[in-house]
Amino acid sequence: AALYASLANSNTGSYGLVCVTYSGNTEVGRKTVYGTIRVVPSRAAPIFSAFDFSASRTDLTGDSSKIISGVSSVTVTIPVADKATSTTSAAIVKYIASVGNATAEAPWSEDAYVYIEVPNAASGTVSVAAVDSRGNQTIVTKLGTLIPYTPPRVSSITTQRANSVDSAVSLQAQGVW
């Protein structure tokens, strides 16, 4: 525990070990050895296992686990009971939420819910990483349902009067929708 505490902000540190030999009360030899001590990241990663998420636009989908590609925002919620912790003297610093290539982060909290909003989500995979002061991470992933969506594109619009003089007008649009 003391070694972890001395490396609260790094996975590596230097040490010096001095070995002194005595004959009675008289020092007869001294040897100093220097080295590097390493924290194994996988053994010192934050303890984190749960979060909740909710996608916007339930008015269209009827279900907060359905994500409309490029339209929905995803709000990640980490309840106090599910907050990340450390058993190796590192401080939990932040959470990073990712939905495909869209990411957002928020600081860790000891006693409050943490909310992270990821705008313009374009994936059904929602991941949250708990990051400690050494930079070690534990990632938890949940799956939502991705609803593909492409906004309409109008490539041309033409108008034409019937018989070139009537008040009725024909409107033609071309594109993808």
Sequence positions of predicted segments:
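Short, compositionally biased P/S/T/A/G/V-rich stretches that sit at domain boundaries
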Residues: 38-70, 146-168
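Short beta-strand segments within Ig-like beta-sandwich modules, predominantly Fibronectin type-III
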Residues: 102-111
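Extended alpha-helical scaffold segments
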Residues: 15-17, 74, 126
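Edge beta-strands of extracellular beta-sandwich domains
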Residues: 27-39, 106, 136-146
